[in-house]
Swiss-Prot record:
Family label: Belongs to the SprT family.
SMART domains attached to this UniProt entry: SprT
InterPro entries in UniProt: SprT-like_domain, SprT_Zn_ribbon, Uncharacterised_SprT-like
Protein name (Swiss-Prot/TrEMBL): Protein SprT-like
Phylogenetic lineage: Bacteria, Bacillati, Bacillota, Bacilli, Lactobacillales
NCBIfam families: PRK04351.1
Cofactor binding notes: Binds 1 zinc ion.
Length: 149
């Protein structure tokens, strides 16, 4: 997909206005779908959102960033808190927040249980069961599930 052409097309179809600045992918974006830079007018987009969430969600994120873009160059309120932004975003059916991405590097939790009081503990890291005990009754801990590494 040619990103610049796609953003120009969305801008014309959904806003009736031309997009004349630069667009690029930014792999460093983690928790956001895109960014608008008022200083030079360019847009950055997160390629992981397009790859993992699909074209429909990505189009709504493009609309969101184009709301910032067009409102800024019209001299209206372009920030999330501004009424102009909220109204335009609603009118073009853009996303307010990007859905959370499936995290590929998250490790499965290890589950421990106290042998005395049956208290359960979830941990990301392994616990040395010879050294550590239950926080409630001081009973021995037992590893219930061992995820495949």
């Amino acid at each position: 997909m040619k990103l610049t052409d796609y953003v120009k097309q969305v801008s014309l179809e959904d806003f009736g206005r031309a997009f004349i600045h630069h667009v690029q992918w930014n792999r460093r974006l983690r928790s956001t779908g895109g960014r608008f830079f008022p200083k030079d007018g360019h847009l950055d987009f997160n390629p992981k959102v397009y790859q993992k969430l699909g074209m429909e969600v990505f189009r709504k994120i493009v609309r969101h960033e184009l709301c910032h873009y067009h409102l800024y160059f019209q001299g209206k309120g372009y920030q999330h808190k501004d009424r102009d932004f909220k109204e335009l975003l609603k009118a073009v059916d853009g996303l307010r927040f990007v859905p959370s991405l499936p995290n590929s590097n998250s490790k499965p939790l290890k589950l421990y249980r106290c042998q005395s009081c049956q208290q359960r503990y979830q941990r990301k890291r392994r616990i040395d069961t010879k050294r550590y005990r239950c926080g409630l009754c001081r009973g021995k801990l037992l590893l219930i599930n061992q995820p495949e590494d």
